[in-house]
UniProtKB/Swiss-Prot annotation:
Gene name as annotated: SLC14A1
Domain of life, per lineage: Eukaryota
GO molecular function terms attached to this record: urea channel activity; urea transmembrane transporter activity
Main localization (coarse): membrane
This protein's name: Urea transporter 1
Membrane topology listed for this record: Multi-pass membrane protein
Assembly and interaction partners: Homotrimer; each subunit contains a pore through which urea permeates. Identified in a complex with STOM.
Classification via InterPro entries: Ammonium/urea_transptr, Urea_transporter
UniProt source species: Ovis aries (Sheep)
Cellular compartments annotated: Cell membrane; Basolateral cell membrane
Keyword Membrane carried by entry: yes
Length: 384
């Protein structure tokens, strides 16, 4: 006689077992497409090289927002196409060229397969297209895009040699260096590749508070995330948030919070409303909030609050740097995010709940937190 009530219930209700199995299969199926899709990467190892290369490129496109997920890469590519197909094309060209260059330079294969040798060039391609004064479909631009994309693995390798001594990531420093170098070399008056003229503020902006639109502020939240890829379309920003959500809900939450804090910082400094609506106050703080809020620091309440502080600090630093760099005719790009986040990662504290992740163990926030909890448990049990 079987006294197991579960077994009796399943025998009497024949449809119970399939439903239970279905509920179990759904989280398992989601596990294959969320996170960093490690199982898919393992499955690709014995597949044709061309198929693997496509995976590396898609991961490179998504790595701009710290995501190593090819499906997220596809969604982000869709968002770029919604914004501007020409920018999407330049971003893809940059990613492909940079990844190929990394292969030719025999860079670390695990970094290449994770998309870490492509994401800087994704931004280089997109932003070179945006800052080009020749407009869309100026096909000659693909040559300097390819040339500058080839410098990204060189910058990455050189910076990694220095920053690895402190176990720090290179972030988008290679992108900032490559784009700043290109825009400085060409400028607005170059006869072949003129760029958009960047000028400092020379008069008091006309800010009329009664004209502030709540709807526009609401739209500026996804636009702030979209501006990470140089997109001012709220639909594109919404797609990017969905791509981040697919990989990590915690990252998506911090991306949105970071953009919101950027808006608040802009309002606190009485910034021109059009700049806030365009998301120019949100993208650096969004990246900073993701980086500290679970990506490069294990997520706890303490690091969550630290991420909020870093996002605000980044937004104010962005305002400062944009004024300074405009004097020499350059945009601030993601310099504020890189400098502010590196500063926060160099923070030393005796608080055990503020735990900086070893770079070799960084994956995505949920997995990082599991590693942190296991590491803490081993530390507690060690003396025993």
């Amino acid at each position: 006689m079987d006294d197991n009530p579960t077994a009796v219930k399943l025998d009497q209700g024949g449809n119970q077992a399939p439903q239970g199995q279905g509920r179990r299969r759904l989280p398992k199926a989601l596990g294959y497409i969320t996170g960093d899709m490690k199982e898919f990467a393992n499955w690709l190892k014995d597949k044709p090289q061309a198929l693997q290369f496509v995976d590396w490129v898609l991961r490179g496109i998504s790595q701009v927002v710290f995501v190593s997920n090819p499906i997220s890469g596809i969604l982000i590519l869709v968002g770029l196409l919604v914004q501007n197909p020409w920018c999407a094309l330049n971003g893809c060209v940059g990613t492909v060229v940079s990844t190929l260059t990394a292969l030719l330079l025999n860079q670390d294969r695990s970094a290449i397969t994770a998309g870490l040798q492509g994401y800087n060039a994704t931004l280089v391609g997109i932003l070179m297209a945006i800052y080009s004064d020749k407009g869309n479909y100026f096909w000659w631009l693909l040559f300097p895009v390819s040339a500058m994309s080839m410098t990204c693995p060189i910058f990455s390798s050189a910076l990694n040699s220095v920053l690895s001594k402190w176990d720090l990531p290179v972030f988008t420093l290679p992108f900032n260096m490559a784009l700043s170098m290109y825009l400085s070399a060409t400028g607005h008056f170059n006869p072949f590749f003129p760029s958009t003229l960047v000028t400092p503020v020379t008069s008091v902006p006309n800010v009329t508070w009664p004209d502030l639109s709540a709807l526009q502020l609401l739209k500026s939240l996804p636009v702030g995330v979209g501006q990470i890829y140089g997109c001012d379309n709220p639909w594109a920003g919404g797609i990017f948030l969905g791509a981040i959500l697919l990989s990590s809900p915690l990252m998506c939450l911090h991306a949105a919070i970071g953009s919101l804090l950027g808006i608040i910082a802009g309002l606190s400094l009485s910034a021109p409303f059009e700049n806030i609506y365009a998301g120019l106050w949100g993208f650096n703080s969004s990246l900073a909030c993701i980086a500290i809020g679970g990506m490069f620091m294990a997520l706890t309440w303490q690091t969550h609050l630290l991420a909020l502080a870093c996002a605000l600090f980044t937004a104010y630093l962005g305002a400062s740097m944009s004024h300074v760099m405009a004097v020499v005719g350059l945009p601030s790009c993601t310099w504020p995010f890189c400098l502010a986040t590196l500063l926060f990662l160099l923070l030393t504290t005796k608080n055990p709940n503020i735990y900086k992740m070893p770079i070799s163990k960084v994956t995505y926030p949920e997995e990082n937190r599991i590693f942190y909890l296991q590491s803490t448990k081993r530390t507690v049990q060690g003396p025993l």
